[in-house]
């Protein structure tokens, strides 16, 4: 489990029944960063515009610098900087114990990153990582990966809509097929 800005534990079980788009970054990830929070906010907005208003999609960004991105630091970040209102629960920023985060991100999502290297000029150190978004269905199954810092929002919206339709139309034995299916294997890009 990881922690939200409010210090509350967030587990994969909390996301059950929700479609979730995971991303990975850190607060000091700016100019030359492969996937900054600003980039994620733009993707979130574009995907939101491409989806029907009633589509249940939660965005979760996991910090790759949990030693510096504490819950207190996440809480100081104004919601507007994340492209949301103060009461919008649809984008969670998570942090946690550095080792737990490494296990969760590497073991659970296959995202590997370096520890921040402290530069000599006093600026925050950079974390090296490959940008990635991961779409997880309401059963906790990874259904698609987008290995780019700026994925096509129409592609994500299409995939989310396919999952919504798939879940709505599956019953009995078809439901078992739904649970075992992986979007990136079943649907062409």
Tell me what each language-model feature is.
Residues 19, 33, 44-51, 78-85, ...:
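Sec/Tat-exported extracytoplasmic proteins
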Residues 1-10:
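N-terminal signal-anchor transmembrane helix
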Residues 37-104:
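Structural microenvironment flanking redox-active thiols in thiol-disulfide oxidoreductases
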Residues 10-40, 59-60:
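Short active-site neighborhood of thiol/selenol oxidoreductases, capturing the structured segment around
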Residues 3, 92-96, 114:
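Short acidic-hydrophobic, aromatic-tinged amphipathic segments that line or gate anion-handling sites
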Residues 116-189:
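Thiol-/selenol-based redox modules, centered on thioredoxin-like
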